[in-house]
Amino acid sequence: MNGQHSSPGTPVQRPSAGPVNQAQFSQQRTNQLTSLLHTMTMYQQLAQNVGLNTPQGQVYLLQAQTIRRQLQGHAQSGQLPNQQLLQQLQSNGALQQGTPEPSNTRPRPQLNAQEQTMLLVRHRQLQTAQNYLTEMKEALGRIKNELSTNERLDTSAREALVKQESELTVKIAQFTAAISNGIRSIQQLQNRQASSANGNNTGTSTPVNASTDTRKSTASTPQLQQTQAQANAPQQRINPETSSVPETPVGVSAANVSNESTELATSATQQSGLANNVEKSQTPSYMSANHLPKVDSKSPIPFSVPPSRATLTGGYASGSIGLSTPGLSRAPHYELDNGNRLLSKRKLHDLLQQIDSEEKIEPEVEELLLEIADEFVESVTNFACRLAKHRKSDTLDVRDVQLHLERNWNIRLPGFASDDIVKSARKTGPTPSYQQKQNAIGTAKSLNKD
């Protein structure tokens, strides 16, 4: 363009950006290493504030040691870009840049990606457990203060507080034991790493042993992982960050510098996030999970329903018996409009239709008839029960109901007539002599008329 043409194969001169990019990567790496160094110093200060022998102080020291190992790897490789960083590492007890170690001193083992991930996960678990332990201790103190100072508590409220106090005491003991086991397992992991490093220097061990020790250390703290199962779930939803921080030595080329910068940025972000989450309070899961009602679900019990009518397929509609659905008998309609009455409104309307289909019944009369039916059945039942009790019987018989209906209401049950009523209603037939006399009287009357 602009009058300048380039033939095919002619090299085009472009400005070189190599030194500028190298300087930018170097500055970025310096900032990231400085951030890691400040994070390590902050963890050391926090450990001194809470106490080096306390469980929380041990957690802070372990986190500071993890960051220090990363910086030591860069110092031993001679890739620290700033002399000031080297002096700060030396003041914190780190190795000097480019200084060879004596042969009689034991080198500190370098952590691979798997071991570093494991340590970070353990640190998070210990930190979360320590936060929940602090919250539970505060809640226990409030409950004890309420029980000792508030004299207006009723019996149910006091029993509920005492129950919560006992539950918190048990959980505090469990969390304390889990934290102690977690710290002990991390220390054992570090000791095994040191011994495996010595074995590798003397040629008596292989990387397989290191991985075996890692698996053993992973299985040494099941109690801590079970205790923190509910604690890690909300933390992972709030802070979805990767726990794996691979350690890659700093190279000379621009690609290696870019990879190193990305990994250091991830590590610095993770360590800063852990430091910021130290004093954040979260709602413990035991405050809601343990008070939820337990639902016992029962498996359904299979049952067979006989077919409603005889069919050629044995109760199945059509087709194959194994592929079709059996015909089920329909349940009778359940009426809800009776209002706990013995006689339903539907039956009353049916009776009215049988007597006269054109007549209507008013709601007040309908309620009155339903009440009369209920009172009638109740009175008959009570009187029949008294008769059965008078007979010294525990079972109500038909004759008890029958006697009350016949004597008091003049109602005879069809098919259930008593013996005395049958005798009174029985008619005697005339004798032959009486029939002859009646015939003679009839004949005489007819003759007199003629």
From Swiss-Prot:
The record's subcellular locations are: Nucleus
Q: Where is the Histone-fold domain?
A: 338-413
- What residues bear Phosphoserine in this entry? S297
Q: Which GO terms describe its cellular component?
A: nucleus; SAGA complex; transcription factor TFIID complex
**Key words of the record:** Nucleus, Phosphoprotein, Transcription, Transcription regulation
Its primary localisation, in coarse terms, equals nucleus
Q: Which residues form the signal peptide?
A: none
GO-annotated molecular function: DNA binding; protein heterodimerization activity; RNA polymerase II general transcription initiation factor activity; TBP-class protein binding
- Matching InterPro entries: Histone-fold, TAF12, TFIID_TAF12_dom
Where do the segments described as Disordered lie? 1-29, 190-281, 426-450
Compositional bias, Low complexity, is annotated for 217-236
Query: Keyword Nucleus: yes or no?
Result: yes
Biological process terms in GO annotation: positive regulation of DNA-templated transcription; RNA polymerase II preinitiation complex assembly; transcription initiation at RNA polymerase II promoter; transcription initiation-coupled chromatin remodeling
Q: Which domain of life is it from?
A: Eukaryota
Composition bias (Polar residues) maps to: 1-10, 19-29, 190-212, 237-246, 255-281, 430-441
Q: Name the job this protein performs.
A: Functions as a component of both the DNA-binding general transcription initiation factor complex TFIID and the transcription coactivator SAGA complex. Binding of TFIID to a promoter (with or without TATA element) is the initial step in pre-initiation complex (PIC) formation.
Q: Which family does it belong to?
A: Belongs to the TAF12 family.
How does the annotation summarize its subunit structure? Component of the 1.8 MDa SAGA (Spt-Ada-Gcn5 acetyltransferase) complex, which is composed of 19 subunits tra1, spt7, taf5, ngg1/ada3, sgf73, spt20, spt8, taf12, taf6, hfi1/ada1, ubp8, gcn5, ada2, spt3, sgf29, taf10, taf9, sgf11 and sus1.
Q: What is this protein called?
A: SAGA complex/transcription factor TFIID complex subunit Taf12
UniProt gene name: taf12
